A protein has these predicted regions:
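ER/Golgi luminal nucleotide-sugar-dependent glycosyltransferases, focusing on the catalytic module
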Residues: 1-214
Length: 214
């Protein structure tokens, strides 16, 4: 089996230590802690952590697990429980069941949960009037934004800081385009689980309620 590298994106706001400790416990309980190299990366944007993974992939033949402290900006809000449950559901797959995920990496470039195809904003956005004639798209991605991949795929991707150039003002921020960074090259991706009923959609449409310290 290839070496395993786990990159944990940790935005150090609110009670970040609680989530980090939770995720490290998942890793240890799964047995991954005994065999994987763990990289804890701090930053206010995921592309900083992705950049470190991307650089690492050029000189290492490895499997990579990407984790993030999902829900950190919802702590102390009415959506804290909703986003916490979502994070734990995701961890229950990619970490607790890690052996199944990596078993598919010989055949696939990336493995994750809750796959979403490319979609037109006009087909789902609440502001129908604004986007009714628009060709703006949301890229294909794993909605969980925690996934497994391998160095042979990562090294083919564009520098994540360069990839953000594809963002346009109509996206409302670069996060939309960045969610598709992992899947921006190739078509060989594997979804293992899909339960979008667990996705905290209500929180996502109320971004103004996030708890982000000034």
């Amino acid at each position: 089996m290839k070496n395993i590298n786990i990159y944990i994106h940790t935005w150090k706001i609110n009670n970040w230590r609680e989530i980090l400790n939770e995720q490290l416990t998942y890793i240890d309980d799964s047995g991954l802690g005994e065999i994987a190299s763990i990289h804890i990366c701090n930053g206010d944007t995921e592309k900083k952590t992705w950049f470190e993974m991307w650089k690492h992939s050029f000189d290492n033949d490895s499997y990579y697990l990407y984790l993030q402290n999902l829900g950190i900006s919802w702590q102390g809000t009415k959506y804290e429980d909703l986003t916490t449950n979502w994070r734990k559901w995701v961890m229950g797959g990619v970490v607790e069941n890690w052996k199944e995920y990596i078993s598919h990496l010989d055949e696939y470039d990336a493995v994750g949960d809750c796959w979403k195809d490319v979609s037109y904003y006009r087909d789902w956005h609440r502001n129908k009037r604004k986007y009714k004639d628009s060709d703006l798209t949301y890229p294909q991605h794993f909605a969980t934004q925690m996934w497994w991949t391998k160095s042979s795929h990562l090294s083919k991707l564009e520098n994540p800081f360069e990839h953000q150039k594809y963002s346009v003002p109509e996206h409302g921020g670069e996060r939309v385009i960045m969610e598709g960074w992992l899947t921006s090259q190739g078509e060989n991706f594997k979804e293992l689980r899909n339960d979008l009923s667990k996705e905290p959609a209500e929180a996502y449409i109320n971004q103004h309620l996030k708890n982000i310290p000034k």
